[in-house]
Design a protein with these regions (language model features):
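Conserved Switch II/interswitch segment of TRAFAC-class P-loop GTPases
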Residues: 41-44, 71-81, 92-154, 167-179, ...
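C-terminal-of-GTPase-core extension/linker across diverse P-loop GTPases
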Residues: 2-22, 36, 142-351
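Conserved G1/Walker A P-loop phosphate-binding module
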Residues: 1-107, 112, 118
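Amphipathic alpha-helical transducer elements in NTP-driven molecular machines
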Residues: 15, 41-48, 64, 81-84, ...
């Protein structure tokens, strides 16, 4: 399951964003750090609904993404200085980061210096970069000691870290830089924050007219009216579409956020179907049939023979697997087949 960490300065509305993501469709639990909250969010997908209506299975399972509302950001002063990289230890395990930036006026919730989304985004990015710099400098110091006593195996790592330090000191997020395979492997071990895929959510209200600043290269941005979305979620489900239409909102906030996270992480959904269960699975775009088999169960990947594949839309159009097979819409694919978004798979394997 992919994890997305939610960060934001105080009074930015990041907890409201998590409430929108939850909206009764997932489950929540306290995290490990003070005031962290974890939400397992069901990914809405009308294809799952339609497949479930077709198969009438005993169980229907949607894809899931875990969101972590972190208490780490916004402590650049005494707490950050005392804690250093440990303050962000839980954040580093996430696959991507979602930064909530305040872009609304509310006298009841004042903010020092006034509302300035460009400033707040710079401050949040600076926290991530400073945290990465602390990690890199600690490692450079350790390797330097080893090199001084004649241990040469750390020379390559030391050179890479020196490059990283230069980039970070220049306040350049690592996600905007190019790294070779060896460097990428090294970076994965450090779980540096400024390398992670980044989604910036500008939290506006219905009166906001400001065009939000660009988040930089290798990052996505979207505008969300979090307070309004929370009010809509509080309505009975049957009343929500009409209310959204009246306000001119084409898409609900949950779908908007999930779709952005899928794009950010390069994810697709594939399905397994049958009378016992209809289930959605996530996979990275470009991964193959063996990767998909491994998502279902490692035994399927180890014993993989072939994958029987049919596009979800074709299966629904046919009305059954038998009719899809009659129309030659089911096909067998080998281990190198790149799974497409919406594929229904049945894995054939050696037991």
């Amino acid at each position: 399951m992919k994890r997305v960490g939610i960060l934001g300065l105080p009074r930015s509305g990041k907890t409201t964003v998590l409430e929108i993501l939850m909206q009764g469709a997932g489950s929540g639990a306290p995290g490990g750090a003070a005031r962290d909250h974890v939400g397992v969010v069901r990914v809405p997908d009308e294809r799952v609904d339609r497949l479930s209506a077709l198969y009438q299975p005993k169980k229907t399972t949607y894809a899931q993404i875990q969101f972590v509302d972190s208490a780490a950001a916004g402590h650049t002063s005494a707490r950050a200085a005392a804690k250093g990289p440990d303050l962000f230890s839980g954040v580093r395990t996430n696959d991507a980061l979602l930064l909530v930036v305040r872009d609304f006026e509310n006298p009841a919730v004042p903010i020092e210096g006034g509302v300035d989304p460009a400033r707040d985004l710079r401050n949040l990015q600076a926290e991530l970069i400073l945290n990465d710099l602390a990690i890199v400098e600690t490692r450079i110091e350790r390797i330097g000691k080893e090199l001084r006593v004649g241990k040469k195996q750390g020379e390559r790592e030391h050179a890479v870290l020196a490059r990283l330090r230069g980039l970070l000191e220049a306040e350049r997020p690592l996600r905007e830089e190019a790294f070779d395979a060896e460097e990428q492997k090294l970076l994965r071990g450090f779980q540096v924050l400024s390398l992670k895929p980044l989604l910036v959510v500008y939290n506006q209200d219905e009166r906001s007219t400001r065009v939000p600043p660009e988040p930089g290269a290798q990052a996505l941005a979207l505008v969300l009216r979090a307070h309004l979305e929370r009010e809509i979620v509080a309505l009975p489900p049957e009343e929500r579409p009409a209310f959204r239409a009246e306000l001119g909102l084409a898409e609900d906030g949950l779908s908007l956020l999930i779709r952005a996270c899928y794009r950010l992480l390069g994810l697709i959904s594939f399905f397994t179907v049958g009378p016992d269960e209809v289930r959605a699975w996530t996979l990275r775009q470009g991964e193959n049939a063996v990767d998909a088999a491994g998502e279902i169960h490692t035994d399927l990947a180890h014993g993989f023979i072939r994958a029987e594949v049919v596009a979800c839309d074709r299966l629904l159009e046919a009305g059954s697997e038998a009719k899809a097979r009659e129309r030659a819409w089911l096909r067998l694919e080998g281990r190198d087949y790149q799974v497409q978004d919406g594929d229904c798979l049945e894995i054939r394997f050696n037991k």
